[in-house]
């Protein structure tokens, strides 16, 4: 089994992958001040729930992607503890199957690189990926598997939280999918603006990208907040 570690701004995702199949996924909070030992203790909690006396979890290797440089080293040390090997850390220098068509490939977020490489290998080209997380990111891969660039926007929950923090009369709102565009109270208005606004952003940006490409593209959506946006988007999504 391969241990996959995805270090995001809000959560660290852990996954076990065997023969191309995802066996489990778990999450920990991203805490920039945690040490390797503290993260290892958190990982032990995750793995202890999945261990079976007759089938212990054994990792043959690890792959790690990170958008939080402060803790990349700590999680890489954890990966080495569980595998006995140095993890593969995602960067433009590893083989992804993509040609990087941007001036500075090393400035592309590693999470975006993983999204783009997976989509290009598994979906019809050209393909656009949308990752709905702390930030909303679009990545564009053309019909020749060239990474053309993309779009970065504030994430759905980031914008919603900012309203509650920066506007004195607006509350913090629990995220859910709105049932209508017209909100009948403050909370429903905020949900409509945030969730439907993100869906309209997705629809509109995708249309403009397709116009620039000169042809339709496959749209692949991922990320922890996708479940709120997919049901209200007008675009055909994968």
Protein language model regions, located:
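Conserved small/polar residues in nucleotide/adenosyl-binding loops
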Residues: 235-238
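Glycine-rich phosphate-binding loops at beta-strand->alpha-helix junctions
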Residues: 34, 65-72, 192, 214-233
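Phosphate-binding/catalytic loop of phosphoryl-transfer enzymes
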Residues: 85-89, 94-166, 195-206
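Polyanion-binding loop/helix "lid" in catalytic or ligand-binding cores
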Residues: 187, 193-209, 213, 228
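N-terminal phosphate-binding loop and adjacent alpha-helix
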Residues: 22-74, 157, 162, 192, ...
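A mobile "lid/hinge" subdomain adjacent to the ATP/sugar-phosphate binding pocket shared
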Residues: 164-196, 218, 225-227
């Amino acid at each position: 089994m391969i241990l996959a570690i995805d270090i995001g701004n809000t959560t660290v995702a852990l996954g076990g992958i065997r023969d191309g199949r995802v066996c489990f996924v778990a999450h920990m909070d991203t805490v920039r001040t945690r040490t390797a030992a503290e993260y290892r203790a958190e990982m032990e909690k995750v793995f202890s729930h999945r261990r079976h006396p007759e089938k212990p979890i054994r990792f043959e290797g690890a792959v790690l992607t990170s958008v939080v440089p402060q803790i990349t080293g700590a999680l890489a040390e954890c990966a080495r503890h569980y595998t006995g090997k140095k993890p593969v850390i995602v960067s433009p220098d590893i083989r992804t199957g993509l040609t990087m068509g941007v001036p500075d490939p090393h400035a592309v977020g590693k999470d975006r690189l993983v999204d783009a490489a997976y989509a290009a290998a598994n979906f019809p080209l050209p393909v656009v990926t949308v990752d709905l997380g702390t930030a909303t990111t679009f990545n564009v891969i053309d019909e020749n598997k060239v990474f053309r660039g993309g779009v970065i926007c504030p994430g759905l929950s980031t914008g919603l939280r900012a309203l509650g923090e920066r506007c004195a009369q607006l509350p913090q709102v629990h995220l859910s999918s709105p049932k209508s565009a017209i909100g009948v109270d403050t909370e429903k208005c905020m949900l409509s603006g945030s969730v439907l606004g993100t869906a309209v952003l997705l629809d509109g940006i995708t249309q403009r990208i397709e116009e620039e490409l000169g042809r339709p593209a496959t749209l692949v959506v991922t990320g922890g907040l996708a479940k709120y946006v997919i049901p209200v988007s007008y675009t055909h999504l994968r």
